[in-house]
Swiss-Prot record:
The keyword Transcription regulation applies. PROSITE patterns: HTH_TETR_1 (PS01081), HTH_TETR_2 (PS50977). This is Tetracycline repressor protein class G. Residues 3-63 form the HTH tetR-type domain. InterPro entries: DNA-bd_HTH_TetR-type_CS (IPR023772), Homeodomain-like_sf (IPR009057), HTH-type_TetR-like_transc_reg (IPR050109), HTH_TetR (IPR001647), Repressor_TetR_C (IPR004111), Tet_transcr_reg_TetR (IPR003012), Tet_transcr_reg_TetR-rel_C_sf (IPR036271). GO terms for molecular function: DNA-binding transcription factor activity; metal ion binding; transcription cis-regulatory region binding. Mg(2+) binds at H100. It holds the Pfam family TetR_N. TetR is the repressor of the tetracycline resistance element; its N-terminal region forms a helix-turn-helix structure and binds DNA. Binding of tetracycline to TetR reduces the repressor affinity for the tetracycline resistance gene (tetA) promoter operator sites. Keywords: Antibiotic resistance, DNA-binding, Magnesium, Metal-binding, Plasmid, Repressor, Transcription, Transcription regulation. One of its GO terms (biological process) is response to antibiotic. Residues 26-45 bind DNA. Disulfide bonds: none annotated. It comes from Vibrio anguillarum (Listonella anguillarum). The gene is tetR.
């Protein structure tokens, strides 16, 4: 019989998530996976919502390797590396962005958040704008991964035509084909670089008035 501790339940939950997706993940299926009776799960998670709240933290612990700035790191480099690492973590599991969306920081995450905020403040951001910048990047990552994972799910539909094939003009046909060739990574990096460039202009304007 599987030793049922919280870590074992979460690990099995992540495996099941990859197999069936968020909508089809149930405590009944999880109990079957663990070869236990469903009530045994309630010692650790009272319901599916409680389980889903725990999965994002496990994803980030496992895959988000750049949540903290390195010594003497440029703030722009940190924001980009942090975002790329966060994106990798969400993409590593099916419906990763959907599960993460709407979650709030828990006590173990407060130390990381404070370190990030203090780092940006030392680089010329006021505390409020440091939080806004971090939130903007986080929301951009989650939103883009939501779109990407939804698109990946659509592509599994048989005989689904490419967008470029449906374009009404040759201009759009060529453009859409180029965008599809470039892929999601190029589009994501463009948006992220644009965000960070905007933060730099706002930061410079504030420093110029001090």
């Amino acid at each position: 019989m599987t030793k049922l501790d919280k870590g074992t339940v979460i690990a099995a939950g992540l495996e099941l998530l990859n197999e069936v997706g968020m909508d089809s993940l149930t405590t009944r299926k999880l109990a079957e996976r663990l070869k236990v009776q469903q009530p045994a799960l309630y010692w650790h998670f009272q319901n599916k919502r409680a389980l889903l709240d725990a999965l994002p933290e496990a994803m980030l612990r496992e895959r988000h390797t750049r949540s903290l700035p390195e010594e003497n790191e440029d703030w722009r480099v940190f924001l980009k590396e942090n975002a790329l690492s966060f994106r990798t973590a969400l993409l590593s599991y099916r419906d990763g962005a959907r599960i993460h969306a709407g979650t709030r920081p828990t006590e173990p995450n407060f130390g990381t958040a404070e370190t990030q905020i203090r780092f940006l403040c030392a680089e010329g951001f006021c505390p409020k704008r440091a939080v806004w910048a971090l939130r903007a990047v986080s929301h951009y990552v989650v939103g883009s991964v939501l779109e990407q994972q939804a698109s990946d799910a659509d592509e599994r539909v048989p005989d689904r035509p490419d967008v470029s094939e449906q374009a009404p003009s040759s201009f759009l046909h060529v453009l859409f084909h180029e965008l599809e060739t470039d892929g999601m990574d190029a589009a994501f990096n463009f948006g992220l670089d644009s965000l960070i460039a905007g933060f730099e202009r706002l930061r410079a304007a504030v420093l110029a008035t001090d």
